[in-house]
Amino acid sequence: MQQTAALPKRLSCDRCYAQKLRCPRPSTNDDASCIRCLRQKVQCVYSTALPKGRPRAAVRACAAGAGATAGAPPITTTTTTAAPSSSDTAPPIFSTEDLASLTGLSTSGWLPDPTWEDSFCFLSSQVVPQPPPLDTTPPPRSLSASGLDNPENCVGRLSDLATRLHAVYQTTRALSDHPLITNAAFEAVTTLFNAPLSPPSAATTAATTNLRETFTSSRHLLETISHLLWATPNNNPSTAPAAAADETVIYHFTIACYSLLLLIYATLLTALHRDALTHTQPSLSTTTTTTGPDNNTSTWCSAPSLVELRLVLLFHMITYFLDRLQQMIRMYTAEFEKQASNSTTGRRPPTSGRWSEEVEEMMVVEEPWEREQHIPPPPPPTSSLGSISELETQARAALMQLRMSLVATRGGLVDN
């Protein structure tokens, strides 16, 4: 003990030395405890100073930091000198237990190397994952509005659309021979949503390609009719006869595309109804776990199969397309007949592309779950839509059959 007392003591106590803080002592008190230890009411311990001839702790930390960073001594120097100045005015942030543990570490002679912070600086830019950059490329548009302003381009687009739909319609008879058309239709929907503009791969079947063309053509026809409804009519008297002829051709091409889509959807819905009857009926070997026949818990609570889930998705998607197509065709027909009556009576057509109040009333279409039947009332005899009302009835009847089969299945996949 006498040899240890003879050695010089460190100017700072162990607590202040471990925290790299100043160690102020009261000048009026004979006690050797520093102000910080007195404030925390802990024992103030002064350890033995380092052997003579070695640099002080601050100088040794600067030299070690300069050797570790190899070329960045200003950063290390700034870090070691700025920390004490900012901590002098800050209140103590360590509890009594933390300070006691730090005191024990300082007494044992183990201190953290101040160069560790500089050695692990590379982790901030290499280990922490950064979010990927945002893709600012706008999504491609399937139809160009500027191209549809020209009647010749619009006729060309509708003619190509009718040609593709006619080719698809010729192959729809094979849908009745397909073993499971639900999977092919769902694959067509998946490829349509993933890459709308990419060509089909070699692995896709002919049925998947044709069904994808059906869904794509439905969307293109909706976009074309929407543009035709909002297009400003031609008010030039000199070009009015030619414009009326172009509008007549465009209208008949639109009705032809709509008729082909109705035929294709009617055949597709019939094939889906066959799949629903084959793959969604509950098994006859299912046992009844309750007393009543209406409370077959094992059948009602069983998980739906993948085919059943795909049928529900296809049912709602086809319902949406049929509702939107019928709604847009009704509005476009009303606007076309209004323009035709104005041209025959000599009245000036409206100067804006907005449709009349009668057409706006047609926009209020009830959802499939809000109406009792899916088959709408037939159009009036004077309307030019009388020729396609039978096709709409066939498509709606096939949709109703598929809906009833999904309602009757286990769990009631579609609300009644």
Curated annotation (Swiss-Prot):
This protein's gene is called: caaR
Main function: Transcription factor that positively regulates the expression of the gene cluster that mediates the biosynthesis of the acyltetronic acid derivatives carlosic acid, agglomerin F and carlosic acid methyl ether.
BP GO terms, sorted? positive regulation of metabolic process
Residue ranges of coiled coil: none
Q: Which residues bind DNA?
A: 13-44
Q: Which PROSITE patterns match?
A: ZN2_CY6_FUNGAL_2
UniProt feature, compositional bias: Pro residues: 130-141
Asked if the record carries the keyword Amino-acid biosynthesis, the reply is no
Annotated region described as Disordered, given as residue ranges: 68-90, 130-150
Please list the GO terms describing molecular function. DNA binding; DNA-binding transcription factor activity, RNA polymerase II-specific; zinc ion binding
- CDD domains given in the database record: GAL4
Which positions, given as ranges, span the membrane?
Answer: 249-269, 302-322
Localization terms from the record: Membrane; Nucleus
Q: What is this protein called?
A: Transcription factor caaR
Q: Does the keyword Transmembrane apply?
A: yes
Q: List the GO cellular component terms.
A: membrane; nucleus
Please tell me the species this chain comes from: Aspergillus niger (strain ATCC MYA-4892 / CBS 513.88 / FGSC A1513)
Sorted keywords for this record are: DNA-binding, Membrane, Metal-binding, Nucleus, Transcription, Transcription regulation, Transmembrane, Transmembrane helix, Zinc
